Amino acid sequence: MIGDRWVYSNNLQETYQFDSQGRLVEIRTPNARSVSLVYSADNVVVTSEAGEQLIFTQDIKYQPLTLSAQGLEVDYSYDGNWRLLGVQKNRAGSITNRSFLYENQMYPRFLTGIIDENGERYATWTYDASGRVVSSSHADGADHTRVAYNADGSTSVTNSLGKVTNYQYQIVNGVKKVVAIEGEPSPNCASSNSTFTYDDRGLLKTKTDNKGIVTTYDYNERGLEVSRTEASGTAQARTVTTEWHPSLYLPLAVTEPDRITRYRYDDQGRQLSRTVENR
């Protein structure tokens, strides 16, 4: 905590501050730029360090109603069930509308389609009786993808070219993890015919690709990768180790077979220097 504020920092070195009511009041990025949020009974004003402002209003569910920023005005509309029905944008008098559809009677809150600014159906989703998505497509059936949920717990995905990829899963530390991908290699599925194992924390331990080449991984107590060995167990094995900053999610040194790269940062996590030493 800082004063009466709660502070959250992520592994991207972004910092979020919340007030005593749990409202986000500041965002700070690694380059020390910040955005502040000020709340009133009427609206929320978001201000950047450069003085640029974005103002929005919310309903009682904290869903956006209006937004204005630098010549752009946006209005959001909802039905009686709080479902987003439309977004209207007005930029210098040019007005566009986008609509959202909910056509599944069994799951009336599930999004089934989007009507774009030209009045054309841009996207369509369908679901099975269990509420799982079974198909996705864009206008005129482009990028049509089908999903089948198999009795053994695996999932089969058929892309728009008719290629089928099968995903097998395992529950690791309470989280569903992919343990095998089987199918024809394609730009959309570069990891076809690969297998994966995980440690007790659910972190990736090994990956075996479609050529049988194994990559192994090790982590520190913070869950950060400290060692990765490619082509493990072969004469071509290549190991990369990483030394991490004790409190920030930033590398201090990355050691590869032919070089060591070292980094220095200031107290806010901004990179001060990067040096490369040949080995």
Model-derived features with residue positions:
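Extended charged/polar low-complexity repeat regions
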Residues: 1-279
